[in-house]
Amino acid sequence: MRNAWEVNFDGLVGLTHNYAGLLFGNEASTRHRFQVSNPRLAAKQGLLKMKNLADAGFPQAVIPPHERPFIPVLRQLGFSGSDEQVLEKVARQAPHWLSSVSSASPMWVANAATIAPSVDTLDGKVHRTVANLNNKFHRSLEAPVTESLLKAIFNDEEKFSVHSALPQVALLGDEGAANHNRLGGHYGEPGMQLFVYGREKGNDTRPSRYPARQTREASEAVARLNQVNPQQVIFAQQNPDVIDQGVFHNDVIAVSNRQVLFCHQQAFARQSQLLANLRARVNGFMAIEVPATQVSVSDAVSTYLFNSQLLSRDDGSMMLVLPQECREHAGVWCYLNELLAADNPISELKVFDLRESMANGGGPACLRLRVVLTEEERRAVNPAVMMNDTLFNALNDWGDRYYRDRLTDADLADPQLLREGREALDVLSQLLNLGSVYPFQREGGGNG
C-alpha cells in the first residue's frame, strides 16, 4: 500500500457573492433571494475554515474564484459596446441575465469536477473530469475557466489528467463530486467509487417537483473518462422523494470517508440493497444511517447536517465538520451528541460559521473538492495554492483590499465592481502562480 492523504481544495468566495435566488430546487437560495450580502465576510468565513483545518493537520488548498460579471456571455446574448455599455444595457433591458453572469457559484467547488485517485485508475494517474453543470444556466458557464484553473493547479501532465466537461445537453447533466463518494480502507488502497444519479433515460423513477440534475448516463461517462477500474464502480440512484424536498445534490443527504457512509435513512432509492452491496464489496464498511424519527429530511436540509466534512485523523478516528446551523437546531444537535457517544469512528464535532455561503445553499462540503494524493503527487501540485500562515495572511489582506462588505442586486451593474474584480483576480493569479487563466487576461479586458 502506498501512503496517500486526502487534500481538501476549498473554493474562495468570489467578489460578487450575492443573493439572486438562482437555484430552483435549492430552498436556502430561494428563501434568501435579494437579501444584502457581505462578500468580504463570506470570503473570510471560508478562509477561516481552511486555515483551522490546515492547522489541525488536514492538508488544505485553495481554488480561486471566477471572473464575474462574465461579460463574454453577455456579448453572446447580443449586448454590444464597451464593457461598461454592455453592463448598462443588460441592467436596463434584461437584469435577470446580469444576475446570472454575476453569480459567485464557482465557490462551491464540490461541483467543479469528479476526482479519481491514481490507485483507482487504469493508467495510474490522478484523473479529474470537469462538471458541465448543465441544469442551471449560471452554473453551466463555469466549466471552461474551471478547466483552466485545474490545469494551472495540477500542471504535471505525467501525474495528472484533466478532462473537459461532457457535452452541454440535459441527457449528460453532471454535477461533479457533489454526487460522488469513495469508500474503502486507507487512502492509499483501492477504493469503491459510488456515483449517485437522479434520473436516467427510460426510467420513470424521478422527482416531480424539483429537477434531478445528475443523470446516470453522465455518471457512466465520467467513470470512463476518469479511467476508473470497472471493478471499483457502483452506480446508485438518489431517492427522488428527497430531491423533491430540496436535496438537490447527494452531498446534502450523505457524506462518506474511508469505510464510513454517513447518510439519512431515506437518502437512496433501494437503500438496503445498496448498503448490502457496499458491505459485500468494501472491507470494514460501516453505514451510519440517521433515522427520520430523529432527524427529518426537512431538518437535514435546513441545517445541512450531511453537507458536512468527515475527516480522518492518523489514529483512524474521524472529525465531523459542521455548519453553525447544526448546533443551533436542538434536535440535530441532540442527535449529533448521541452519535459521538455511540460506537463509531466519529470522535469530534467541529462547527464553523459559514452563514454567508449557507444562505445561498452551500455548506462545508459544497465549498471543498477532495483529492486523494500520494506524497509524490502532492509535491507536484502548484505549491502556491497550499494553505499555510503566509497564504492565509496574504489572502486576508487581498480580501480586505478588494472585497466589498455590502452588495445588493443593483450593485451588479456598477462598472467599478467589474474593474475591482478584474484587478483583484489579476493580483490573485500572480499570488497563486496561475498564469493567465481568466479570459479578460488573455483578451486584455477587451471592449468589443
UniProtKB/Swiss-Prot annotation:
EC main group: hydrolase
Pathway: Amino-acid degradation; L-arginine degradation via AST pathway; L-glutamate and succinate from L-arginine: step 2/5
E.C. designation(s): 3.5.3.23
Transmembrane segments: none
Alphabetical keyword list: Arginine metabolism, Hydrolase
InterPro entries tied to this protein: AstB_sf, SuccinylArg_d-Hdrlase_AstB
SUPFAM superfamilies, sorted: Pentein
Catalytic reaction equation(s): N(2)-succinyl-L-arginine + 2 H2O + 2 H(+) = N(2)-succinyl-L-ornithine + 2 NH4(+) + CO2
Binding positions (substrate): 20-29, 111, 138-139, 213, 251, 360
GO MF assignments: N-succinylarginine dihydrolase activity
Claim: Cell membrane is one of the keywords in the record: no
Active site: E175, H249, C366 (nucleophile)
GO BP terms in the entry: arginine catabolic process to glutamate; arginine catabolic process to succinate
Recorded family membership: Belongs to the succinylarginine dihydrolase family.
HAMAP family: AstB
Quaternary structure note: Homodimer.
Function: Catalyzes the hydrolysis of N(2)-succinylarginine into N(2)-succinylornithine, ammonia and CO(2).
Name assigned to this protein: N-succinylarginine dihydrolase
Species, as recorded: Shigella dysenteriae serotype 1 (strain Sd197)
Lineage start: Bacteria, Pseudomonadati, Pseudomonadota, Gammaproteobacteria, Enterobacterales
